[in-house]
Amino acid sequence: MKNDNRIIKNTIKQFKEKLCKDFSQKANITSITRKLAVFIDTILIQLFIKNKLHFGDNFCLLALGSYGRRELQLHSDIDLLILHTEKVSNIQLQRAQKFIQDCWDVGLEVSHQITTVSSCANLASQDLSVISTIMDMFLLCGHGALMEELIYQTHTLHMWPSHQYFFAKLQEQQNRYAKYGETAYNLEPNIKNGPGGLRDLQILLSISKRHFKIKKLAEGIGYGFITDKEYEELKYCQNFLWRVRFALHMLAGKPEERLSFDYQVKLAQFFGYQDQSHILAIEQFMKDYFKVIKRNRELNEMLLQWFNETIVYHQKQKIIRLDDEFQLSNRFIEVRNNRVFKQNPQSILKLFYWLVKRPDIEGVRASTIRLIRESLFLMGKRFRESKETANIFINIFRTGNDPYDALQRMNRYGVLAHYLDCFATVTGQMQYDLFHAYTVDQHTLFVIRNISRFKKNEYAKQFPLCAKIISALEKPEILYLGALFHDIAKGRGGDHSELGAIEAQQFTQRHYMEAEDSKLIVWLVRYHLLMSQTAQRKDIYDPKTIEQFCQLLPHARYLDYLYLLTVADICGTNPTLWNAWKDSLLKELYHAAKTRLHKQQELLDEAALISIRKQYAMDILISDGISSRVIQDLWSQFKGKYFLHESPEVIARHTKAILNSKQFPVVIIMPHHSQGGTEVFIYMPHKDERFTITTSVLSNHHVTIQEAAIITCDNQFDLDTYIILDENNQAFLNEQRARDIQKSLCDHLANTGRLPAVSRRRLSRALTHFNVKTQINFIDDNTNHQTQLFLVTNDRPGLLATISRVFLTLNIHLHNAKIATAGERVEDMFYISNQTGYSLNHEEKTILKEKLILEISKSKY
């Protein structure tokens, strides 16, 4: 018996290998999935007969789910139902269990149920998944009357009438969408369960089976709910997804459903995609994938809406006239006749204007969605150059209401891509990195959604400054259009901000926009990264930084638009990207620039600013009973840079801690004054290796450094400030953890022995799939006798500790650091000098660059 099972197992293996070979040679995927199902039939029937279950009328073996539909993928589960009569003996039931064991022994991934017809029907009446799989059952072997009885007992006359089944399946889909983030455009999408995936096809078949009692979706053409063209589109989507899924199973050697980064690369290679000058093979493959997902979801939405109207709202319609062309039917917008778009193509856009103007409209009637899709060819050159068309499109953004849902529908139905050629090029465009979580088109729409959220009361607490600014914004449509175009040139090669500004300029001219409005939109697109780059890469406490930033703003009102776009952009790039620290940096930059622009104050010299901050801090300390002479004696040792970088409140807090301390080092861990991060303040006798020690200790405690200010005072004491975040990129809330870090820093900084070892931690799975080439550039700052070192490399645990060790080895002094991580990519700015306190010369730069590249390459673990 064991030998028989081994032979069968080997036969299955050989058959699957043959199928994989055929598939690799472009065999038809529908034929392959059916061949596999039929082959598995023969194995199961053979095992069923071997266990003597085919005699008499006691047992029936049924295939369920995708296996029942004859759509078996390479490593899909084989769903089986064994029905038996009430009179079976224990010996016969043991044979049924032995049959299942034989299935497992030959390597079949079988999920099964052994039950009676009545028990199965009872379970189906309570469980949506059971009734759904039963509807796909296929008789393999045994007494067919048992299956017929189950079909009768689970008929809509007895359970799950079509309207109840429809609502349950609709809720199931909504729950599934919520689980996968409401979008199909995630970095590592699930081909089976994600929005737009294979489940979106299966729900259409299940509901149509339940309502129309059909066996195949093609039969639905006769009922009028699907056209020949739509059916062909669904078949195309299905075949594409089946091919990808079969290849995914083949490459993974298991039932893998997620297109993880490593499999995306392999799939692109398998399907013959090749890298091009400005777009990777993987990005081309995923763009095709996302386009199919988008089309699949679009058809899913339209046909479910049709079911909703047919199954649920088949009663008398409540009609409300909107204008000569549109009306509401049970709160869904529809055309008043099927000639509307042909007679006036501009009405295609007008429909979406109504959706924005009337937020009470719940959606679009399925018949009208179908008409939109069939009328896209009308949106040609003449349509796009029409002034009426331009006015309607701009008015979508001028209603004062949220345009996100309407724009999302315009994207799903293909209207945006037909109206804006440049939008068509970014539809489905992904970027192969961890920073951008969505395709460019979906990210763009999320940015617009975020802008709309700033207006809503439920988001005012999360974005109070944004809510305040947008409430007074003169022309919100400018902000929306800036958002629509800010990434429009992604994937072309070159500077997407500059290329996008050209597209925006052409758009504003074609849409007859006022010169000042056009100028602002184009400027927003060109400079949409300015604020985030300034806040995260430069010293925003330096008045020169604020002055340089403000010089790029043609008018004070530009700042409001740029701030709102920046926050919306960051929040729409990746759900994990926005945090309190970024929030605080942008707010501080905004307020500093606002003061400079609105008060038109003269740029104060450093001495004046230092004097002002000292006086405020002095007042705080004197009110606490500390002598001004003691304060001045201490401050006389501090560099002016310290007073520029810190607020008066923080200066007072640091001063008080130092004066009250009886031993060194002084280590204070406290919330940063902006509450966006946690501050680590260190004051101690000068020690060259203190930056290396500090970065190593913080790395071992799994915290990340966002900023570092390193100062050696005139009395040869070090005065250093770090801003740190926890693993979730948030400020510390755990006081015990802060105390542990404080103690560890004190112990190691006081120790004159060896440097603390940096604990080795594995890279996350996602990080291992990306390789950012280490790039190092130098810029000399002759005013401050410093060199700016800009470093780009792969993120990894302990990176800053590695860099600090190189600095220590080469006697490089760090003065300031700005740390920025974008997914797998680190972009760090270090302000350094040589051991004599001057900018690095050419030889020193060369040695430092070579050493950094070497040590960073060795630290990738």
From Swiss-Prot:
Residues 322-678 are annotated as: Uridylyl-removing. One of its GO terms (molecular function) is phosphoric diester hydrolase activity. Uridylyltransferase (UTase) activity is inhibited by glutamine, while glutamine activates uridylyl-removing (UR) activity. Residues 1-321 are annotated as: Uridylyltransferase. Disulfide bonds: none annotated. Pfam families: DUF294 (PF03445), GlnD_UR_UTase (PF08335), HD (PF01966). The keyword Nucleotidyltransferase applies. Keywords: Hydrolase, Magnesium, Multifunctional enzyme, Nucleotidyltransferase, Repeat, Transferase. This is Bifunctional uridylyltransferase/uridylyl-removing enzyme.
